Amino acid sequence: MAAVPQLSAPSAPARSADGILIGDRQYSEVYLTIDYSLIPEERLSPTPSMSDGLDLNTETDLRILGCELIQSAGILLRLPQVAMATGQVLFHRFFYSKSFVKHSFEIIAMACINLASKIEEAPRRIRDVINVCHHLRQIRAKRTPSPLILDQSYINTKNHVIKAERRILKELGFCVHVKHPHKIIVMYLQVLECERNQTLVQTAWNYMNDCLRTNVFVRFDAETIACACIYLAARALQLSLPNRPHWFLLFGATEENIQDICITTLRLYSRIKPNYEFLEKEVDKRKVALQEAKLKAKGLNPDGTPAILSMGGFSPASKPSSPRDVKTEEKSPNFAKVKREMDDKQSSKSPYNGLRKENKRSRSVSRSRSRTKSRSRSHSPRRHYNNRRRSRSGTYSSRSRSRSRSHSESPRRHHNHGSPHMKLKHRVEDLRGRHAHKRKKSHSPSKSREPSELAKKHRHEHGHHRERRERSRSFERSHKNKHHGSSHSGHGRHRR
């Protein structure tokens, strides 16, 4: 008979302070127990809201308002008391991690209601939660209740509630389990043989519901809170309970913790009812102050513009010269001389074989004169004053057109001129010298038609277009009688 192999049970993984050792690898572990839902004493003060500038009384009033909103909305939504209690505990836990200044307590309260209804298996639609909170807000403001309009504001509020619900889960590490003392109260009263006293049971239950507005649910466990509620109810109804030894020692509670819970609960009844408008203004002030502090730390003004530092940095007075100074320097008498020297240096390095721009312009003048009459007429721009462009000879009219066109391309220069008679005399002599020089030399485009002296004169000449046309007409009339009969190679091209 074959032997049956024995199956050995797998060995339990070895635990250590750093995690769980499985095989030759070590893995981390996460403990999800109710003990981790209690906040240690060092985190109770200062809270994040107090770090942002809110005092303890204002924060306590905001906690009370948020819990009252959750309780009232839960009643209208017909939620079980366990779901409403879970929502209030989640509300307290969240605001020990975040500040009332940075998060709206109304949005967080609606998110806690929505999340608690899912946890306690009594889900409600988020639309119903928003409508109920809107109705309670109108009643608190003493206004006539009106239905919520499904506009963009409603969509924004809905998105804020959904995001706040995810934020609560993230801040609490998805540890949203809450252990409530409701059943524990009934169980302890059965041990004390007082379960038939309905007044005692209901009074202890009421104290427990009122404790939800305080922070005792995040400081003590459910068994201690149940003992404190029974202790308060017995004292209020003047009922005697075993005290030798004290009855609460049987359930693991201490006298110091019970006294602390009782004092915290009784202080709740002595507080003035919080004013919602006043608390909202206080939170808005702290928001503005916090925003200004952030902008100041970044070096910005409250309106978002960059702040000008008194020491160092850029200063408008540190500029070497203002734009007005530059304009006056350009108009100085030395500026033209310096600019001319700079043009000479640039002309020597220009790609025009060492020729200046003025010489290139004179070459364009000679090219325009060598064109045919038909081409010069087709390319010449039409002007509205045709009576002034008429001439007796087509040869000189084409030359005057090309000459006026080439002169119009030259830049304007503002200089002081002499009398009109002297200007006309110099103009006639200049044109005679040009005409005699053009007869001697060929009309090849490779050479310049004007000597350097005429180029310099042409550079300094300036006048309006009308004056130039008048001068050319007077020259044509006086020069036609002398050279009309002479034949010229350049003029022969324009004859038909």
Swiss-Prot record:
Q: What's an example GO BP annotation here?
A: regulation of transcription by RNA polymerase II
Under the GO molecular function aspect, what terms does this record hold? Answer: cyclin-dependent protein serine/threonine kinase regulator activity
Q: Where in the cell is it found?
A: Nucleus speckle; Nucleus, Nucleoplasm
Q: Domain of life, per the record?
A: Eukaryota
Compositional bias annotation for Basic residues = 358-392, 412-426, 434-446, 456-468, 479-496
Database matches in SUPFAM superfamilies? Cyclin-like
Task: Note down the stretches annotated as region Cyclin-like 1.
Answer: 68-170
**Annotated region described as RS, given as residue ranges:** 363-406
**What spans are recorded as compositionally biased (Basic and acidic residues)?**
322-347, 469-478
Q: Keyword annotations for this protein?
A: Cyclin, Nucleus, Repeat, Transcription, Transcription regulation
- For region Disordered, the annotated ranges are 301-496
Give positions of region: Cyclin-like 2. Answer: 183-267
Annotated Gene Ontology cellular components are: nuclear speck; nucleus
Spell out the family assignment given in the record's similarity comment.
Belongs to the cyclin family. Cyclin L subfamily.
Q: What is known of its domains?
A: Contains a RS region (arginine-serine dipeptide repeat) within the C-terminal domain which is the hallmark of the SR family of splicing factors. This region probably plays a role in protein-protein interactions.
What function is annotated for this protein? Answer: Involved in pre-mRNA splicing.
- What's the protein name? Cyclin-L1
Organism (species): Xenopus laevis
